[in-house]
Amino acid sequence: MVYGDIMNNTLDEYIKKYEQKTKDKFKPKEGFKLFYLPSRGFCELSTTKDNSMLMIYQMAGDGKFWRDFATVFAQMLGIKKLGTICIRENIKAYIRFWGYKVTKKEPLHDGSFIYYAENKEGKKARISPVHIHDDITRISYYVTWDI
């Protein structure tokens, strides 16, 4: 999602928008590299310890651009999976936004679900709950997908 008009914003402006949207204070994640482009926003990336996955952490600005950026970056490193944490309230809308369809819904003991999804290219994704927030209406999810 692009915040407002497509225009150049400073990193501080993107951070302010990130904090307003997430209601969390931005703090650079240790071990992650921050990438920033004035017309696209910012994104933090790092590999897992075994280099099997490229992780996208905090991000603001054009999400589809940063997904594509991370995909190319991972391909350069020979990595075949991407991962992130979704803090959006509507996980099914999030899955659709990225072009996936749920193929399987696995119920968990706490009433939440693990979602398995696939896009038009046959690439698979797994979306699993990681944290149920205090108000119980919001769940954060680990999202991993093949590239």
Regions found by a protein language model. Give the residues of each.
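A conserved beta-strand-loop-helix scaffold within acyl/acetyltransferase catalytic domains
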Residues: E19-N51, P129-D134
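Secondary-structure transition/turn motif
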Residues: Q58-G63, E118-G122, V130, Y142-I147
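Short amphipathic alpha-helix that is part of the acyltransferase structural core
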Residues: M1-D24, Y141-D146
